[in-house]
Structures are given as C-alpha cells and as structure tokens.
C-alpha cells in the first residue's frame, strides 16, 4: 500500500460496525423482553415506537462503542508493550507491518450484520475475528523475532488477556453474589 495512513480509520469504522450490529441485536432482544414483561405497551403511551427503538439503539450503541474502544486501547497497549519487551525494533517497523491487520476487523464488522438475530453469534464472531488478527500479528512479526522472543510475545499476550477475562468474570461473580446476598429472602 502506497499511503500508510489510508488504513488509519479502519479501526474506528470496525468499532462502529461491531457496535452497531451488537446494538441492533440487543435492541431487538430488549424490545422482546419489554413486550414479555408487559412494559412495552405502557411505554407506547408516552413515546412513539420509533422513539423507543431509537433510544434503545443509541443507548446500546454508546455502551458497545465505549467497551470496544477501551478494548482496542488496551489491546494496542499490550501489543506495543510486548513488542517493547521482545522485539529488537527501535524504528517501529513491526507496527507498520501490523497496520493492515485492521482490515480483518473491518471485514469482520461488515460480516457481523449477517448475524443480527443473536447477540451470542456476534460475540463468537468477534472472538473468531480477534483470533484471526492474533494469528495475522504473529505471522507478520515472526521473521523479526527470535524463537524465545516470539514465545515471550505470544505468552505475554495470552497471559494478559487470560488474566483480564478471568478478572472481569470474577468481578461480575462477586457483584452478583453481593446483590443476591443483600436481597431479603
């Protein structure tokens, strides 16, 4: 690619695509839940149907955009920290090699609209796209790293994300248990 800045907007567009598909799917599910609880008809007395749909979409889109943006920031930081520790690349050539990987997320974001009927399928698709990006990352930089540096890079990335996911799950379990313990039984 001639201009290295051409792909600079791909991560933002991919985040917008994934957050839009997730928020559409979540909005449809929330509308079903509101209808099953009998709240939707009461809401129609005060708001139009389009207004309710738009408000739900905007709220979920903002939530998913913030989460995906934070994950992108964390992922970039961990990748650059891993490269700092294990790559002998003071000019940053490895980072330039990884720029085209944003096309993987862009394509995944476009294809996520096929899976709008179920949030779980979109999350699974996001995990598959993330795994494909990780394989792309390792493939692009393996020639510049020694075997031990490559193993260290992979282990640091995997260990961080494993610890991060386990930590988030632990926090949600603790929160759930504290809410359940505070309920009068």
UniProtKB/Swiss-Prot annotation:
The keyword Transmembrane applies. The keyword Iron does not apply. Keywords: Cell membrane, Membrane, Transmembrane, Transmembrane helix. Its main location: membrane. GO terms for cellular component: plasma membrane. It is a multi-pass membrane protein. Disulfide bonds: none annotated. InterPro entries: DUF5366. The chain crosses the membrane at residues 4-24, 54-74, 98-118, 119-139, 153-173. It is found in: Cell membrane. Signal peptide: none annotated. This is Uncharacterized membrane protein YufK. It comes from Bacillus subtilis (strain 168). The lineage of its organism: Bacteria, Bacillati, Bacillota, Bacilli, Bacillales. The gene is yufK.
